[in-house]
Amino acid sequence: MATATIALQVNGQQGGGSEPAAAAAVVAAGDKWKPPQGTDSIKMENGQSTAAKLGLPPLTPEQQEALQKAKKYAMEQSIKSVLVKQTIAHQQQQLTNLQMAAVTMGFGDPLSPLQSMAAQRQRALAIMCRVYVGSIYYELGEDTIRQAFAPFGPIKSIDMSWDSVTMKHKGFAFVEYEVPEAAQLALEQMNSVMLGGRNIKVGRPSNIGQAQPIIDQLAEEARAFNRIYVASVHQDLSDDDIKSVFEAFGKIKSCTLARDPTTGKHKGYGFIEYEKAQSSQDAVSSMNLFDLGGQYLRVGKAVTPPMPLLTPATPGGLPPAAAVAAAAATAKITAQEAVAGAAVLGTLGTPGLVSPALTLAQPLGTLPQAVMAAQAPGVITGVTPARPPIPVTIPSVGVVNPILASPPTLGLLEPKKEKEEEELFPESERPEMLSEQEHMSISGSSARHMVMQKLLRKQESTVMVLRNMVDPKDIDDDLEGEVTEECGKFGAVNRVIIYQEKQGEEEDAEIIVKIFVEFSIASETHKAIQALNGRWFAGRKVVAEVYDQERFDNSDLSA
């Protein structure tokens, strides 16, 4: 079946204008396009023509769904573009205000020196966020490096040099973090660590020399604050949980986890400031590599002072929700203006799919296909579409101020939740809820114990793993559909993953097949396990078990 496309031309050049505006224009124009009247035929890309008198055929459900996704993607790109522009404008305004204040205080003409100093500090911060990793085993890939260095903080990028002849990397890489403290911890704790049978070398980039005076100045300024950096924080822990654990070492002035402005969830790291320097030293020496909820905390001294001027802030001091709403309105107006301009300057081809800018980029809000765990070699042969959307954000540059957006409130859900709790538990037998525990005043070892108990109350898994069901030679294109159809008898199947796991590095090593089935709710998972466990399939006795939800969500299929 031939695919219809929309071609947007501006001033005779295809794809003119900014990508978000053009994308929004194409989508909006596709809704308003009507077939021309009095035309004998419309020439398609494949050379065929269709009678205009008969009109265009209605869009299929798949095409309508694709169009809706394109609209959503175009709007998200427009909002993102507007937010970036607003952030840049706000930072420029802050710099201008600082310059004007310097003039008022009698510092002479500070424009050029101040701009130069700000640029030097930004370059120094960028260098401080990067570490060099050498002596990497040639069979190790970017995923393995990311997994090894991720506990120290969010990674912005990994740059590996590849040999175009051998198609293998050259044995070194550069890892860039969001904050300098993450890079400093990685430098201290990863040098000479065994990775892939080799002791890797971790150090600073070679161009750090020119920025060393600025780095020393930042470190000196940081000593005035008794701040520590905490990374690898469990996702289920809150600011108060971390504060209750760390206040055993002294009185805390502030404890804030950096949050994603889109989801409201913390990014796994934050900063704690004590009133006394000794408290911060004790916390670093005692809590580094402390096992909290199955994750080893990474704790170190902050190497930069708090710098709100270098932190991307919402325009005009607006709350994040208000800034996004303002950006959405701006993006909508931009899209309308783009449509109006396209109606005058551009010509439209046959309606159908969207421009290449929308088809080549992955739409926001889609879950990437699961990948195999780095420590367990294997091959994934089938993945069905996943259900929940994952928001995508642009990582900020420089030192991130952890005081960001707070999580969205769930006030509308509370009455329903309380009603369900009353039905499930009589008042005399009702367990103590987490919301009540969060307001308890605890510290020290008691705090650590309470936090661990909180983490033990995990969400039930919705994932079932089928073992000993098929041999690798029995895998074909129909297997995934057959499993989906069979498991659909027990509930809504979100996706099926067929995973082949090699039991060693040898070429003739045994390969076992695991089939992962994700349901919508945990009760459906248990229902399927009861029906399928011990059942015979093609002469093999199937083993059906619950699979750890956190492992599955992290694409770890090796258990």
Swiss-Prot record:
The modification N6-acetyllysine is found at K251, K454. One of its GO terms (molecular function) is cadherin binding. The modification Phosphoserine is found at S112, S244. PROSITE patterns: RRM (PS50102). Residues 77-559 are annotated as: Inhibits transcriptional repression, interaction with ERCC3 and apoptosis induction. The third RNA recognition motif, called PUMP domain, is atypical and may rather mediate homodimerization and/or protein-protein interactions. This is Poly(U)-binding-splicing factor PUF60.
